[in-house]
């Protein structure tokens, strides 16, 4: 089984974390990265 990969995006609300994570995933698929288990975490900074 392939090793688990993790990517995290952090920043203030409204900065585009969800868009960035979706674009990153689309780029990986577009570049034919082999299927690997992956966790994408999206978090915000506390005010």
Curated annotation (Swiss-Prot):
Superkingdom assignment: Bacteria
Annotated EC: 1.18.6.1
Reaction(s) catalysed (UniProt annotation): N2 + 8 reduced [2Fe-2S]-[ferredoxin] + 16 ATP + 16 H2O = H2 + 8 oxidized [2Fe-2S]-[ferredoxin] + 2 NH4(+) + 16 ADP + 16 phosphate + 6 H(+)
Any GO molecular function: ATP binding
Obligatory cofactor(s): [4Fe-4S] cluster
GO biological process, one term: nitrogen fixation
Protein's UniProt keywords contain Amino-acid biosynthesis: no
Signal peptide positions on this chain: none
Keywords of the record: 4Fe-4S, ATP-binding, Iron, Iron-sulfur, Metal-binding, Nitrogen fixation, Nucleotide-binding, Oxidoreductase
Positions bound to ATP: 11-18
CC cofactor note: Binds 1 [4Fe-4S] cluster per dimer.
Any Pfam family: Fer4_NifH
Assembly information from the UniProt record: Homodimer.
Summary of the function given for this chain in its UniProt record: The key enzymatic reactions in nitrogen fixation are catalyzed by the nitrogenase complex, which has 2 components: the iron protein and the molybdenum-iron protein.
Family: Belongs to the NifH/BchL/ChlL family.
Protein name, per record: Nitrogenase iron protein
Lineage, highest ranks first: Bacteria, Pseudomonadati, Pseudomonadota, Alphaproteobacteria, Hyphomicrobiales
